[in-house]
Amino acid sequence: MDTHTTKLVAISLLLLLVISDYTRLMIQVHSYVPFCAYTYDYFSYCLDFLTGYYYKPGKKCCVHIVKLNIIAKHKKENPRLLCNCVEMMTRGYTPPMLADKIQQLPLLCNTHLSFPISSSMDCSTV
């Protein structure tokens, strides 16, 4: 092969890798969409508590946390997906969510969470 053909093959392979990575990323983002929609909707009932406006979570908050637990238990990958949605939602939220309120949420809602929420989540380990 001459150098022109070799360069063309190398560029084609590189382009194929870039497209492959982009496609994988789009599939991953697409898989978050339904989970994040539920997460944002259901978690919105808890924001007044999580940001410190209320001293305890409301009944609607706790009901929706139970619903998120059901979603988390439905498939093996759901806890990680929900964790990523919560992480994306809380990152940069103003006013910030209070770490102690996040930790109190399962206890005050009389439930055990099937997905992690904390101020220092690492969803890659879920």
Swiss-Prot record:
InterPro entries: Bifun_inhib/LTP/seed_sf, Plant_nsLTP. Keywords: Disulfide bond, Lipid-binding, Signal, Transport. The lineage of its organism: Eukaryota, Viridiplantae, Streptophyta, Embryophyta, Tracheophyta. This is Non-specific lipid-transfer protein 13. The gene is LTP13. The keyword Metal-binding does not apply. Residues 1-20 form the signal peptide. Disulfide bonds join C36-C85, C46-C61, C62-C109, C83-C123. It comes from Arabidopsis thaliana (Mouse-ear cress). Belongs to the plant LTP family. Plant non-specific lipid-transfer proteins transfer phospholipids as well as galactolipids across membranes. May play a role in wax or cutin deposition in the cell walls of expanding epidermal cells and certain secretory tissues. GO terms for biological process: lipid transport. GO terms for molecular function: lipid binding.
